């Protein structure tokens, strides 16, 4: 049953999504990969115009299951309206942009297709609980697989976002997330069952269903191994002093890139230490970290641009 490609369960975000960012730093330590991206800059300010366009393309694949997408893909007006409606039903959640960007990075950078559409589950009050923000899979070079559960945070302070994400992942893994409605504690066990129950929404053949189920519930008889991994996306705030904006464009980029790289390098050890303190170091972690200036207003403006 070992396979090279699952045609109906493949990544949908164009790798050109990554061209919206400057990759300032990549760190690989043990099982962990950390990538730090800076948005494009125009005249000493972050420029989100192209990001909005590419996120607009990704939004439909993020919030609609493959079967729903297939139903509406040749009806662009209805498709666009359906996407906007789903987002607007959740606009009280300031983290939606972060979850869309988490999805986009996992698909564009890791080529890790989603296997569950969390937006459809969120908008179904009978199906959703506060579990992972995304569920994807990746085939490794050795032929084995990882089932990746993603966590997204939008925080003013980078390390506060990291701490919150790792704490959430720990609760998720240990099945100690409290359900707001029932008071029950749930986590990865419940999530696996939820995903399994909705496989039909993401697949188009019995063969694909069998494959995806083998990732959710691995069997010793399988021809490949499956390990649980986690992805963390943090969108955080940076303040750019007004005097720095008066620098020449090239000088400004040098200053900003050096400042941001120094910030990340000074925190890498502590980021990995947080994983260790939660006894999660046996898992692979994929970190994607992105700064916005004036985070609250930029977050709102970008998401509104995506939904226009």
Locate the predicted segments by residue.
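Acidic, metal/cofactor-coordinating or nucleic-acid-engaging core segments within structured domains
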Residues: 163-248
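A structured, charge-rich N-terminal accessory region that forms the first stable segment of a protein
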Residues: 2-78
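Secondary-structure boundary elements
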Residues: 107-115, 138-145
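A short acidic/basic microdomain associated with nuclease active sites
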Residues: 110-126
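A short, glycine/Asx- and small/polar-enriched loop/turn
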Residues: 127-131
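Extended, charged low-complexity segments
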Residues: 244-308
